[in-house]
Amino acid sequence: MDCFKVFEVVFQSEINPLLLIPAVATIALTLCCYCYHGYQWIRDRRTARIEEQQAQLPLPLSRISITPGCSMVATTKLTHSRNSVDIY
């Protein structure tokens, strides 16, 4: 249906067009709230997924370990190195 035909029907009817403003505003506000709710839901799911992945992966650990009886200080890197990005 053509847009102009809709306007013609509205203006020819006995309905006051000013009465349609609250209904249109309510529908627009409902649509905005629905879109914002979807945006929040997607953002929360993304945050939860990132937190879940961080909880599953061990933290990159680089520490100095001193072996008893040995004067040498060894650096130990457990699990991750700079090249471990290729694994994921």
UniProtKB/Swiss-Prot annotation:
Transmembrane segments: 15-37
Phenotype of the disrupted gene, per the record: Mutants reach adulthood and show no overt morphological defects but their hemocytes display a more vacuolated morphology than controls with enlarged endolysosomes which accumulate undigested phagocytic material due to impaired digestion. This leads to decreased resistance to bacterial infection and severely reduced lifespan.
Cross-referenced InterPro entries: Hemotin
Biological process annotations from GO: phagocytosis; positive regulation of defense response to bacterium; positive regulation of endosome organization; positive regulation of phagocytosis
Tissue specificity note: Expressed in hemocytes.
Top-rank taxon: Eukaryota
Cytoplasmic side stretches: 38-88
Cell compartment(s), UniProt: Early endosome membrane
GO cellular component labels: early endosome membrane
Topological category with respect to the lipid bilayer: Single-pass membrane protein
Lumenal side: 1-14
Keywords: Endosome, Membrane, Phagocytosis, Transmembrane, Transmembrane helix
Main location: membrane
Function in brief: Negatively regulates early endosome maturation by binding to and repressing the activity of 14-3-3zeta which prevents the 14-3-3zeta-mediated activation of phosphoinositide 3-kinase Pi3K68D. This, in turn, inhibits the Pi3K68D-mediated conversion of phosphatidylinositol to phosphatidylinositol-3-phosphate and prevents progression of early endosomes through the maturation process which regulates subsequent steps of phagocytic processing.
Subunit structure: Interacts with 14-3-3zeta.
Protein name stated in the entry: Hemotin
Annotated organism of origin: Drosophila melanogaster (Fruit fly)
